[in-house]
């Protein structure tokens, strides 16, 4: 798994830098959603590194774990997708919470701004999305898939998925549609800021969507689609929070070398070496 690639100067996983930044920003509870075979390793690995004041839970995403009244399909082996993964954490979270990918680097400012969002707003139907400029999320080694945000008065109106974005000759283009995209457009990198009531919404969304899947053995239930449905139904509003940060990830094998280089540079100025000193 690329989530367990040792990219940091002392062999750290990429997710460890996000965890470190989140803790520095005031987050005090870590919930990881993973496969059964990774549970013990992840918990033990992080528990021995992270201060005991930080609560750690590791949750297994199981295909048989479904909303009450739903029956698991015995033929289903593939995980149900990101919306279901988050729903699986429902018994471990009772407060507002942030969601991130384990294999992305988001930057300290992104977590600081996420914490500020929660500290400044308690409206249970005002959610957030920490967003990045499109130009800062491209790969030098091939096309990327991005959800481009339509924003009005700092609120998210919609997210449009573009599956083949690439910069050529200084122009950013969606090669599926042929459309030229603005490099300063905000995009979603799945850094969501949610309220505890999100699990209630996910209950009904998962049930409805699962009943509409064309291929019950392979199709997935995606977190951005769940958020967008709530937005379209006027159940929630989603504030677009500027990350004020750079992003990077490992989309292609060639990205790995660049990620190692960036983490080494950051560790000379931002992070301690090793990351979890003492």
What residue spans do the PLM features occupy?
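Short, surface-exposed amphipathic charged segments that create phosphate/polyanion-binding patches used
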Residues: 68-79, 142-147, 254-258
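Hydrophobic helical membrane-anchoring modules
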Residues: 234-237, 244-278
